[in-house]
């Protein structure tokens, strides 16, 4: 293995590829925690402006994606008992010190599919839900969700 740049490596093997985001690239949480220790998160809507750069917006985007994927949107159900939501809730709560995530269902969720350059109905294509580091990197790292540009 040979080092090219700081925290970047290259091998002559194509068998394994991975991207590692060092913990020092994760920003301190800016998510607001209410008096009950909860992080209140709403859905991304059709009117949301891109790019999504704030931790709140990226978490909202992730929650909205999971809401659609779980089928809760189509059944008009709460997502509080959804397995993937519970995983995200645990990861974010551990990182922030919150007691959990409370979803605000008052806004109609909606993702402007034409505005997002990398939109895919399968949330797992852009963040591995079961990988704590991937979720934390998505929400607290430098990644952003940007709009599509021709």
Name each region found by the language model.
Residues 1-8, 15-150:
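Long, non-globular targeting/processing and low-complexity regions
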């Amino acid at each position: 293995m040979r080092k090219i740049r700081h925290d970047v490596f290259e091998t002559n093997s194509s068998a394994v590829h991975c991207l590692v985001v060092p913990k020092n690239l994760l920003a301190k949480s800016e998510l607001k925690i209410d008096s009950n220790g909860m992080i209140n998160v709403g859905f991304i809507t059709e009117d949301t402006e891109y790019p999504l750069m704030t931790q709140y917006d990226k978490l909202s985007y992730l929650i909205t994606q999971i809401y659609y994927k779980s089928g809760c949107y189509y059944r008009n159900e709460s997502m509080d008992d959804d397995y993937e939501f519970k995983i995200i809730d645990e990861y974010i709560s551990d990182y922030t010190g919150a007691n959990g995530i409370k979803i605000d269902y008052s806004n109609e969720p909606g993702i402007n599919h034409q505005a997002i350059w990398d939109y895919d109905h399968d949330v797992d294509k852009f963040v591995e839900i079961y990988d704590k580091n991937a979720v934390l990197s998505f929400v607290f790292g430098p990644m952003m969700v940007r709009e599509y540009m021709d």
